[in-house]
Curated annotation (Swiss-Prot):
<dbReference type="Pfam" id="PF00651">
    <property type="entry name" value="BTB"/>
</dbReference>
<keyword id="KW-0832">Ubl conjugation</keyword>
<feature type="domain" description="BACK">
    <location>
        <begin position="135"/>
        <end position="236"/>
    </location>
</feature>
<dbReference type="GO" id="GO:0031463">
    <property type="term" value="C:Cul3-RING ubiquitin ligase complex"/>
</dbReference>
<dbReference type="GO" id="GO:0048208">
    <property type="term" value="P:COPII vesicle coating"/>
</dbReference>
<dbReference type="GO" id="GO:0014032">
    <property type="term" value="P:neural crest cell development"/>
</dbReference>
<dbReference type="GO" id="GO:0043161">
    <property type="term" value="P:proteasome-mediated ubiquitin-dependent protein catabolic process"/>
</dbReference>
<keyword id="KW-0968">Cytoplasmic vesicle</keyword>
<keyword id="KW-0931">ER-Golgi transport</keyword>
<feature type="repeat" description="Kelch 3">
    <location>
        <begin position="380"/>
        <end position="426"/>
    </location>
</feature>
<protein>
    <recommendedName>
        <fullName>Kelch-like protein 12</fullName>
    </recommendedName>
</protein>
<dbReference type="GO" id="GO:0042802">
    <property type="term" value="F:identical protein binding"/>
</dbReference>
<feature type="repeat" description="Kelch 1">
    <location>
        <begin position="282"/>
        <end position="329"/>
    </location>
</feature>
<keyword id="KW-0879">Wnt signaling pathway</keyword>
<dbReference type="InterPro" id="IPR017096">
    <property type="entry name" value="BTB-kelch_protein"/>
</dbReference>
<dbReference type="InterPro" id="IPR006652">
    <property type="entry name" value="Kelch_1"/>
</dbReference>
<dbReference type="GO" id="GO:0030134">
    <property type="term" value="C:COPII-coated ER to Golgi transport vesicle"/>
</dbReference>
Length: 568
């Protein structure tokens, strides 16, 4: 070869792996092994240099003046033979097989032998398995073994899923101190203090004799002044544990005073009157009927923490009379009217795909629907009623995102467009609407276990195009049109007593209004007041039974889809 060739360092990608494979073959054939690890009377031949290179534990054992330094056999205590085999496989192959069955033995053993790679793999596996039923146990397990990242992940998970976590045995078996630590946390994500109070009562009831004296200490971390007066009088006052404790009664009286003496609230500020930080939730408003007198494709996002609006990518098809729900970090925009025909198509916003999200189409409904009601229950989306351009529907269908498929369910008793659909206590409620002849005040509910609809107590006012949302244990119905007037009135349905009450009216009449719950308050979004389209948004505080206008969108609209998304 002619010319001058400069020297060059060349590194192969397979050299280290090849050496590991060769050393593993030598181990399995007991060739050149210079130490035997003995665990539960089972011998594991190995190479000191390999063990020392992978583990600070073995490095210290074989390089210091410990008694094991020159011994051909080393007894390893505190782990099983099967676990030792998994760990040795990792040392020689870089691969570890972690399962639900072995992780509780594997992680402590990895900590003992200081195998950082195995410890990390176990922590990542446990984090992937976090669930409301096990997150508290995983948190304690992580703390015991100084797995800081896993402990923090489990703690955040328990805060994020607090209402579900407290339903499981791990919560009931916590010590008083552990319950205090959880419920005093600002970061637990609850729509109200109701699940916090109920969690404390259920924990005490599990072992009444031993725990009853702990109730006053725990109750001081429940932010009772932030509960509604109705809940305080109907639920808390009726609780025997509360009536029997003077200290508990004092805390209840403080909450009542907060409501009865608003002029004293500034003097009563403290940990119990401070709202929890809750989830980082944002409000999305999608499509609708805009100021150009036609359907629009504009999507706006409102962050209540910063009180700022921003635009997201537009939906692919302009729609009014549209329904919208959120499910598993995705927003679904369902049906509607594009100015020419009613739609069965459905678009989805994958909000986690990138900064602004990506819209794509999913399976269309079986029926074209504008002004349909939509809600979620479990992992499914339910859509009922609506108008297809020629008739109003009684039908309901359900979407399973796991298989991208819609299926028809039992029909409602009454055909409805412009009705509200909402879930409460595992039951779907459909409220009001228009049947083609009359505006309705009737309400029916669907039991997913039986597949049947039944009537419940009707609303006081006939309403079509009202906003509907669940807050605490009440279904709120806001605004709408009664056939002659655009409404500002609001009524609330108590799901426990099957009864309606009237609450304070909105500041503005709103028909074709969106309604949703954000950070423990009810929001009424945009709509039509009988003269003009609205961009304003008002917020209802159930604690003081009062509405206030909080912000305005950049776009005037009605008939829009509205939902809340929990940001990562």
């Amino acid at each position: 070869m002619g010319g001058i060739m400069a020297p060059k360092d060349i590194m192969t990608n397979t050299h280290a792996k090849s050496i590991l494979n060769s050393m593993n073959s030598l181990r399995k054939s007991n060739t050149l092994c210079d130490v035997t690890l003995r665990v539960e009377q089972k011998d594991f031949p190995a190479h000191r240099i390999v063990l020392a290179a992978c583990s600070d534990y073995f490095c210290a054992m074989f390089t210091s003046e410990l008694s094991e330094k020159g011994k051909p056999y080393v007894d390893i205590q505190g782990l099983t033979a099967s676990t030792m085999e998994i760990l040795l496989d990792f040392v020689y192959t870089e691969t570890v097989h972690v399962t639900v069955e072995n992780v509780q033995e594997l992680l402590p053993a990895a900590c003992l032998l200081q195998l950082k790679g195995v410890k990390q793999a176990c922590c990542e596996f446990l984090e992937s398995q976090l669930d409301p039923s096990n997150c508290l146990g995983i948190r304690d397990f992580a703390e015991t073994h100084n797995c800081v990242d896993l402990m923090q992940a489990a703690e955040v998970f328990s805060q994020k899923h607090f209402p579900e976590v407290v339903q499981h045995e791990e919560f009931i078996l916590l010590s008083q101190g552990e319950v205090e630590k959880l419920i005093k946390c600002d970061e637990i994500q609850v729509d109200s203090e109701e699940p916090v109070f109920e969690a404390v009562i259920n924990w005490v009831k599990h072992a009444k004799k031993e725990r009853e004296e702990s109730l006053p200490n725990l109750l001081q971390y429940v932010r009772m002044p932030l509960l509604t007066p109705r809940y305080i009088t109907d639920v808390i006052d009726a609780e025997p544990f509360i009536r029997c404790s003077l200290q508990c009664r004092d805390l209840v009286d403080e909450a009542k005073k907060f409501h009865l003496r608003p002029e004293l609230r500034s003097q009563m500020q403290g940990p119990r009157t401070r709202a929890r930080l809750g989830a980082n939730e944002v409000l999305l408003v999608v499509g609708g009927f805009g100021s150009q007198q036609s359907p629009i494709d504009v999507v706006e996002k409102y962050d209540p923490k910063t009180q700022e609006w921003s635009f997201l990518p537009s939906i692919t098809r302009k729609r009014r009379y549209v329904a919208s729900v959120s499910l598993h970090d995705r927003i679904y925009v369902i049906g509607g009217y594009d100015g020419r025909s009613r739609l069965s198509s459905v678009e989805c916003l994958d909000y986690t795909a990138d900064e602004d999200g990506v819209w794509y189409s999913v399976a269309p409904m079986n029926v074209r629907r504008g002004l349909a009601g939509a809600t979620t229950l479990g992992d499914m989306i339910y859509v009922s009623g609506g108008f297809d351009g020629s008739r109003r529907h009684t039908s309901m269908e359900r979407y399973d995102p796991n298989i991208d498929q819609w299926s028809m369910l039992g029909d409602m008793q009454t055909a409805r467009e412009g009705a509200g659909l909402v879930v409460a206590s595992g039951v779907i409620y459909c409220l009001g609407g228009y049947d083609g002849l009359n505006i309705l005040n009737s309400v029916e509910k669907y039991d997913p276990h039986t597949g049947h609809w039944t009537n419940v107590t009707p609303m006081a006012t006939k309403r079509s195009g009202a906003g509907v949302a669940l807050l605490n244990d009440h279904i709120y119905v806001v605004g709408g049109f009664d056939g002659t007037a655009h409404l500002s009135s609001v009524e609330a349905y108590n799901i426990r007593t099957d009864s309606w009450t009237t609450v304070t009216s909105m500041t503005t009449p709103r028909c074709y209004v969106g309604a949703t719950v954000l950070r423990g308050r009810l929001y009424a979004i945009a709509g039509y007041d009988g003269n003009s389209l609205l961009s304003s948004i008002e917020c209802y505080d159930p604690i003081i039974d009062s509405w206030e206008v909080v912000t305005s969108m950049g776009t005037q609209r009605c008939d829009a889809g509205v939902c809340v998304l929990r940001e990562k």
